[in-house]
């Protein structure tokens, strides 16, 4: 479909950026003993700002979870059906230790590294609650 006009009053999509590139975040990680996690935080930040992760966030927000209380035979099942994008977001979050890494890692600064990862993993914040 050809463009009908030039749109000049809208910002471009915010994608392919790294929220972990903040010098303030880097300084805080180093100061609080989490320098060992800089590479992990940077890697997660790059994924967070990617077009793919932004799309997952958009789909997860657009397609709300569906509560299924009973199956087709009337048996109680109480399950929640999530969009596959929500599962992708969760897979990344759990894979990077956002759920419990500091309690399994005794290195100094482990809570700071987790906090930094949580702050940069921003495509859709509801799945971290």
Description of each model-found segment:
Residues 1-107:
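Extended, charge-enriched "interface" segments that sit outside catalytic cores
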